[in-house]
């Protein structure tokens, strides 16, 4: 059956598109127009363009480029997304639009989806080389390799000649045999009713974007800030990515912004944005591959106030899948303008891969066999001119760059430690050797981040990095002293016990310092989840009969301080979800006064904790409680507090928020 032709709507094309020329494969753009069948089959139609020197606009591609925001009508003060403008018509790739995009918008859109045409094409950076096709089935993979190997020998002249031949491209044939799913009118109507294609009013959306770049992006710089702002302003930004950004930033915007967006609190706002992004993803409303990857990575760092099957583990796996499919690890090796962005993306994924495995060794390392790339440096950030966007973007500081670099180094240190402790015959000497660089790493941070003596904004990145390091040291030492890896060396367990207590003390100090400087609400989710893990460790120590009375008393005092910290961020969805579970545990064991009448007692314990001891040398003793628990409740003492297994034993819903690093 003859294939549908789009040539009638396009001018005569006498050469292959840029991606096909780069890959040295046949291009049927002369027959079907742009995007060609090869680019469509690889799900990268936005990358299908002619060489930049042609300087002409192909009408067939105009239907793929969203209109500028200035042409988008305002509905109840909300911005309509580019996709919503096409409703209720079908959104298949064959649908044409009579409107034409401004060439400037096309260049901005192309820049956001990969890079400008002045450098190598996004396809040449993001995609695997011709021997590594992306077919899902083995036989298709083999056939594609055969076709690509044959086509690779062709010259540009043969490419030019093949453009006038009938469409016999293997990739195009695969696309027509197995077309991607399309949304029908019912799907479009459902998504429209869910307001998936709508964004908050522009003035509030600007506040959300600014909050994202101020409080979220510095710890995971997976966006090219200038490209994102340009595509956002032009209205061509992927709606999935925008909803993901809004979900992450909803923790940091003011209450007035939440009200202006139509949400009464942070939990409702975050859940709404998260749900819209999830629907966009589940209905296969595909944006460009890079935006889908970035959005998945952002959603992978979000914890809702209720359980979800699409938790951070799901989005992390999805991010790795998309990154591998795009060939991000190969793009990191190229020397072009987009290399910096892809290197940062790959290192963020690499860090998460190690930390997810470190938290729970039952998790599989997804990137363990990935080819190594050179370490991240300060040169891996773009040189930006943000004067035009100064109302949204702030300059990137030295501390922000060093923060991610330090996280990468930390991941390498703990990755080396885990390779030893999980080996068949780990030795104490080897563990000591692998953990030794951690102390030097911590000592070097203040100088590398150019910190001042007084508490400044840059101190946030320093404290966040230290918090992550002490948290994972607690995890490792706690498991070592509990014999998790069958370590029979008594000296090693004593060493692990000492380092565990020192790390707990440092975490307590950091939390208090952040509270005193009123900075706790500006810290990322990774810091917030560390506070919950810290509280669980204090509860464990307070209820551990094997601990001395001194340790148990100090743990009880620390519980009060940690609960005060959580109270400062109780409107955060992750904490809102955790507090009821903690309150049940604490109330059941009389570790925390739950009534307002006990406020004075809390303040007294805070004052006494500063001096550590009374004037007569005795440690402050909490009210006597019956430490004998029912048999059903004793079992949680032997569970993993970091994973909150003890809550499962009380038939509480599983809380996965400590799993996020």
Swiss-Prot record:
DNA-binding positions: 17-48
Keywords attached to this entry: DNA-binding, Metal-binding, Nucleus, Transcription, Transcription regulation, Zinc
Annotated localization: Nucleus
Pfam families: Fungal_trans, Zn_clus
Residue ranges of the region described as Disordered: 57-131, 151-185
GO biological process: DNA-templated transcription
Compositional bias (Basic and acidic residues): 99-109, 120-129
Record PROSITE patterns: ZN2_CY6_FUNGAL_1, ZN2_CY6_FUNGAL_2
Gene3D superfamilies in alphabetical order: Zn(2)-C6 fungal-type DNA-binding domain
Protein's UniProt name: Fusaric acid cluster transcription factor FUB12
Organism: Gibberella fujikuroi (strain CBS 195.34 / IMI 58289 / NRRL A-6831) (Bakanae and foot rot disease fungus)
Classification lineage: Eukaryota, Fungi, Dikarya, Ascomycota, Pezizomycotina
Gene that encodes the chain: FUB12
């Amino acid at each position: 059956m003859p294939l549908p032709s789009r040539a009638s709507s396009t001018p005569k094309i006498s050469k292959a598109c840029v991606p096909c020329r780069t890959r040295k494969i046949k291009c049927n753009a002369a027959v079907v127009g742009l995007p060609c069948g090869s680019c469509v089959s690889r799900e990268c139609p936005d990358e299908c363009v002619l060489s930049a020197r042609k300087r002409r606009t192909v009408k067939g591609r105009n239907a793929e480029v969203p209109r500028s925001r200035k042409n988008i009508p305002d509905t109840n003060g909300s911005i309509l997304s580019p996709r919503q403008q096409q409703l209720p018509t079908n959104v298949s790739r064959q649908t044409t639009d009579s409107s034409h995009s401004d060439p400037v918008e096309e260049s901005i859109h192309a820049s956001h989806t990969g890079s400008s045409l002045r450098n190598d094409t996004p396809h040449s950076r993001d995609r695997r080389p011709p021997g590594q096709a992306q077919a899902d089935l083995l036989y298709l993979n083999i056939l594609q390799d055969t076709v690509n190997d044959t086509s690779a020998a062709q010259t540009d002249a043969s490419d030019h000649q093949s453009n006038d031949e009938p469409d016999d491209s293997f990739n195009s044939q695969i696309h027509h045999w197995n077309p991607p799913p399309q949304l029908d009118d019912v799907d479009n109507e459902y998504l429209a009713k869910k307001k998936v294609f709508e964004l908050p009013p522009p003035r509030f959306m600007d506040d959300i974007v600014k909050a994202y770049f101020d409080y979220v992006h510095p710890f995971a710089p997976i966006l090219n800030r200038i490209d994102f702002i340009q595509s956002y302003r032009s209205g061509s930004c992927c709606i999935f990515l925008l909803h993901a950004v809004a979900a992450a930033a909803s923790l940091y915007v003011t209450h007035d912004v939440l009200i202006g967006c139509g949400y009464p609190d942070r939990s409702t706002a975050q859940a709404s944005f998260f749900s819209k992004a999830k629907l966009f993803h589940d209905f296969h409303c595909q944006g460009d591959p890079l935006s889908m990857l970035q959005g998945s990575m952002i959603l992978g760092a979000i914890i809702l106030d209720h359980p979800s099957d699409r938790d951070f583990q799901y989005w992390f796996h999805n991010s790795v899948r998309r990154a591998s499919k795009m060939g991000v690890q190969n793009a990191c090796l190229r020397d072009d303008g987009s290399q910096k962005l892809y290197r940062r993306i790959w290192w963020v994924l690499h860090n998460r891969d190690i930390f997810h495995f470190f938290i729970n060794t039952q998790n599989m390392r997804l990137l363990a066999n990935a080819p190594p790339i050179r370490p991240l440096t300060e040169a891996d950030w773009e040189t930006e001119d943000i004067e035009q966007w100064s109302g949204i973007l702030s300059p990137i500081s030295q501390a922000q760059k060093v923060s991610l670099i330090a996280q990468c180094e930390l991941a390498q240190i703990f990755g080396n430690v885990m390779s030893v402790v999980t080996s068949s015959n780990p030795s104490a000497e080897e563990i000591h050797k692998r953990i030794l660089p951690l102390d030097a790493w911590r000592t070097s941070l203040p100088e590398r981040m150019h910190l001042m003596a007084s508490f400044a904004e840059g101190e946030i990145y320093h404290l966040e990095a230290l918090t992550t390091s002490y948290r994972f040291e607690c995890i490792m030492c706690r498991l070592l002293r509990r014999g998790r890896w069958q370590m029979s060396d008594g000296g090693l367990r004593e060493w692990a016990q000492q380092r565990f207590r020192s790390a707990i003390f440092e975490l307590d100090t950091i939390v208090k310092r952040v509270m005193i400087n009123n900075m706790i609400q500006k810290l990322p989710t990774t810091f917030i989840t560390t506070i919950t893990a810290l509280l669980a460790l204090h509860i464990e120590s307070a209820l551990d009969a094997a601990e001395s009375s001194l340790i148990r008393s100090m743990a009880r005092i620390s519980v009060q301080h940690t609960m005060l910290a959580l109270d400062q961020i109780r409107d955060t969805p992750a904490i809102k979800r955790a507090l009821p579970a903690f309150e049940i545990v604490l109330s059941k064991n009389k570790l925390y006064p739950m009534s307002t009448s006990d406020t004075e007692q809390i303040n007294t314990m805070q004052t006494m904790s500063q001096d550590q001891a009374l004037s007569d040398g005795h440690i402050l003793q909490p009210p006597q409680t019956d430490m004998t628990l029912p048999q059903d409740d004793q079992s949680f003492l032997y569970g993993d507090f970091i994973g909150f297994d003890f809550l499962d034993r009380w038939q509480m819903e599983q809380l996965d928020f400590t799993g996020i690093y």
